[in-house]
């Protein structure tokens, strides 16, 4: 993989990418750690679900708003302050034992003050590489993000089982502060100044590529939410974690194999269609553990390439300030999409049968493919790959 090596050898790339992953590692643990801790503290899955929902809503609302503040406050000051506030709220959740409503409020604060690490990193990436390396860098970034979702839940479970759920949530708080500070101290970030956007808040949504990204991400991630809930319902809690992990494994492989190959306007449609193949496969044997595992692996092959392609398209379509806001809207779409897909699948399961979740997964997958098809004309051509690829 000579071109991936060339990207990593560029000054600052490894430093920014590595510290970004550490700063965001808490997000990989967040869902499971909060559910385990709040349920154990208050003995109620309902309260645990509300707590996680509050955090998700907070993060969805704050994404684009915080991205707009990067030019006014400066990325280092903003993300450092946000990480400190969010981590303080996490520590409150970890150690508070009073009325549950205060934990819900604290979880909302956690979401509202989640530092926009990924938006900052993706906005600064294009300044660290040559134009022909764009697809490689965003493919590498999207692929490595899967590590958060592979190891985050595992670590949350291990710490909770070995020590306590309190220790798991407290660990997230510490990792977030330390990782964010390491990220913020990078010279590429510490001295970074975002030019003020000439657009009003939400102005980037007037550009068709942003609408395309929001639609595709919302529907695609909604299919993942439904798939996760369905997998747990059909197979049970214990095997579900491993089976869902194969989707991330497929995404890791797909990211390195295909993510950098995006060039044409139709690349996004091709990669989203790969996920649809996996979603259709599951109907052949909808309750078999091995077949579901294989199906989710195929789904994963298209995940990282899809996210990498979308990130690359945003990078070549906007300047730093506007790209950060655009990534914020995409993050909001993903959060709302996952929550919506999971909720719809849960309702369908409760009122019909467990494997009915696959119909929700398939429907959302079809919506993602159609979104990619009808918005392909708005996609920019991506820079040609390096000749040694």
Regions found by a protein language model. Give the residues of each.
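Helix-loop boundary and gating motifs at the non-cytosolic
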Residues: 2-58, 204-247
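Helix-to-loop junctions at the C-terminal end of transmembrane segments
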Residues: 61-75, 160, 253-267, 349
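Structural signature of the two symmetry-related core transmembrane helices
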Residues: 77-91, 170-173, 267-281, 362
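Cytoplasmic helix-loop-helix junction between adjacent transmembrane helices
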Residues: 108-147
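A membrane-interface helix-boundary motif in multi-pass transporters
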Residues: 161-174, 347-366
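C-terminal transmembrane helical hairpin of 12-TM major facilitator-type secondary transporters
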Residues: 267-310
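A late C-terminal transmembrane helix in Major Facilitator Superfamily
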Residues: 322-353
């Amino acid at each position: 993989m000579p071109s991936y090596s060339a990207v990593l050898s560029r000054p600052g790339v490894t430093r920014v990418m590595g510290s970004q992953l550490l700063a965001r590692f808490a997000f990989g643990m967040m869902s499971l750690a909060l559910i385990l801790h709040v349920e154990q503290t208050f003995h109620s899955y309902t309260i645990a679900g509300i707590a996680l929902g509050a955090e998700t809503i907070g993060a969805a609302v704050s994404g684009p708003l915080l991205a707009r503040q990067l030019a006014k406050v400066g990325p280092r000051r903003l993300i450092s302050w946000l990480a400190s506030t969010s981590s303080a709220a996490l520590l409150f959740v970890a150690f508070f034992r009073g009325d549950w409503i205060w934990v819900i409020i604290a979880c909302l604060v956690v979401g509202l003050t989640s530092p926009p690490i990924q938006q900052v990193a993706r906005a600064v990436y294009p300044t660290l590489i040559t134009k022909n390396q764009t697809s490689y860098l965003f493919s590498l970034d999207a692929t490595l993000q899967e590590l958060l979702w592979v190891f985050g839940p595992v670590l949350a479970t291990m710490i909770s089982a070995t020590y306590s759920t309190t220790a798991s949530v407290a660990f997230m708080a510490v990792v977030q502060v330390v990782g964010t500070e390491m990220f913020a101290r990078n010279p590429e970030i510490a001295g970074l100044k975002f030019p003020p956007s000439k657009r009003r808040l939400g102005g980037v949504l007037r550009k068709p590529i942003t609408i395309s990204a929001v639609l595709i991400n919302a529907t695609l991630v909604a299919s993942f939410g439904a798939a996760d809930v369905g997998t747990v319902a059909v197979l049970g809690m214990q095997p579900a974690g491993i089976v869902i992990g194969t989707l991330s494994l497929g995404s890791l492989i797909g990211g390195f194999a295909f993510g950098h190959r995006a060039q044409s306007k139709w690349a996004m449609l091709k990669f989203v269609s790969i996920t649809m193949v996996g979603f259709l496969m599951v109907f052949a044997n909808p309750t078999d553990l091995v077949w579901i595992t294989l199906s989710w692996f195929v789904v994963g092959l298209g995940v990282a390439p899809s996210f990498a392609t979308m990130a690359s398209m945003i990078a070549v379509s906007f300047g730093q300030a506007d790209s950060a806001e655009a990534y914020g809207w995409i993050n909001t779409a993903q959060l709302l999409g996952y929550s919506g897909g999971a909720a719809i699948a849960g309702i369908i399961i409760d009122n019909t049968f467990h494997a009915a979740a696959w119909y929700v997964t398939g429907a959302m997958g079809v919506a993602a493919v159609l979104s990619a098809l009808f918005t392909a004309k708005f996609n920019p051509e991506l820079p040609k790959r390096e000749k040694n690829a």
